[in-house]
């Protein structure tokens, strides 16, 4: 299936009034995770634009350290995903504690970059946009269009770059399983 770039959402939808933001329920991790995944899929192009702007500014100020940081993060992420698909312990950790998995990737990247220097470039250039994405995705309430777009992604009617990344992190498998179970129950 072809990979489609999600459309750029209107900025007044991306940053609406405060009535469309709410603190997540920290006691219900699965609901919070669902909100984050849904918003990451729906606003992925907006997140990419914001991250590209921030990374460009930091990269302009310190290009070598920014490139080094990007290479290290990509290599560490790829290594952890490969290891998680080949080792049961990492696979379980990635599935049960996705936030911890991402934090381990970030900490490992931080450690490797600190060996080469340029730690602050890494923190502000790469990690800060990721942190902003996570905060926005956690706080932004979903709307009906968001839910519809996510269902299309979940059942495989469309593929997006963020969907591929979330699949690598095994964040969409559970939803697809739940959806197929729901359909089979409806048939009975």
Curated annotation (Swiss-Prot):
Q: Which residues form a coiled coil?
A: none
Q: How does it sit in the membrane?
A: Multi-pass membrane protein
Give the residue ranges for region: Targeting to endoplasmic reticulum membrane.
Answer: 136-188
Keywords assigned by UniProt?
Answer: Acetylation, Cell membrane, Cytoplasm, Cytoskeleton, Endoplasmic reticulum, Membrane, Transmembrane, Transmembrane helix
Q: Which GO terms describe its cellular component?
A: cytoskeleton; endoplasmic reticulum membrane; membrane; plasma membrane; presynaptic cytosol
The protein's location, in the record's own words, is: Endoplasmic reticulum membrane; Cell membrane; Cytoplasm; Cytoplasm, Cytoskeleton
Gene Ontology annotations of biological process type: cellular response to oxidative stress; glutathione metabolic process; intrinsic apoptotic signaling pathway in response to oxidative stress; L-glutamate import across plasma membrane; L-glutamate transmembrane transport; learning or memory; negative regulation of L-glutamate import across plasma membrane; negative regulation of mitochondrial membrane potential
Pfam families, per the entry = PRA1
Renumbered residue ranges of the record's region Required for homodimer formation and heterodimer formation with ARL6IP1: 103-117
Q: Which residues carry this modification: N-acetylmethionine?
A: 1
Cytoplasmic compartment: which residues? Answer: 1-35, 78-93, 136-188
Q: Please tell me where this protein is predominantly located.
A: endoplasmic reticulum
TM spans (from-to)? 36-56, 57-77, 94-114, 115-135
* Function, as annotated: Regulates intracellular concentrations of taurine and glutamate. Negatively modulates SLC1A1/EAAC1 glutamate transport activity by decreasing its affinity for glutamate in a PKC activity-dependent manner. Plays a role in the retention of SLC1A1/EAAC1 in the endoplasmic reticulum.
Q: Which family does it belong to?
A: Belongs to the PRA1 family.
- Kindly state the subunit structure of this protein: Homodimer. Heterodimer with ARL6IP1. Forms multimers. Interacts with ARL6. Interacts with prenylated RAB1A and RAB3A. Interacts with SLC1A1/EAAC1. Interacts with RTN2 (via first transmembrane domain). Does not interact with VAMP1, VAMP2 or VAMP3.
Q: What is this protein called?
A: PRA1 family protein 3
| Gene that encodes it | ARL6IP5
């Amino acid at each position: 299936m072809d990979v489609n770039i999600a459309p750029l959402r209107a900025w007044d939808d991306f940053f609406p009034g405060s009535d469309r933001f709410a603190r997540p329920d920290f006691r219900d991790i699965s609901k919070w995770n669902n909100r984050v995944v849904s918003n990451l899929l729906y606003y992925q192009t907006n997140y990419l634009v914001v991250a590209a702007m921030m990374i460009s500014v930091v990269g302009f100020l310190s290009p070598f350290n920014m490139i080094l940081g990007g290479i290290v993060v990509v290599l560490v992420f790829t290594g952890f995903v490969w290891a998680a698909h080949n080792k049961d312990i990492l696979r379980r950790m990635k599935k049960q504690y996705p936030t911890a998995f991402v934090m381990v990737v970030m900490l490992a990247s931080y450690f490797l970059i600190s060996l080469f220097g340029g730690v602050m470039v890494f923190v502000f250039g790469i990690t800060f946009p990721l942190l902003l994405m996570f905060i926005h995705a956690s706080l932004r309430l979903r709307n009906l269009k968001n839910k519809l777009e996510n269902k299309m992604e979940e059942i495989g009617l469309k593929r997006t770059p963020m969907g591929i990344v979330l699949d690598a992190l095994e964040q969409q498998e559970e939803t697809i399983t739940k959806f197929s179970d729901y359909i089979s129950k409806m048939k009975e």
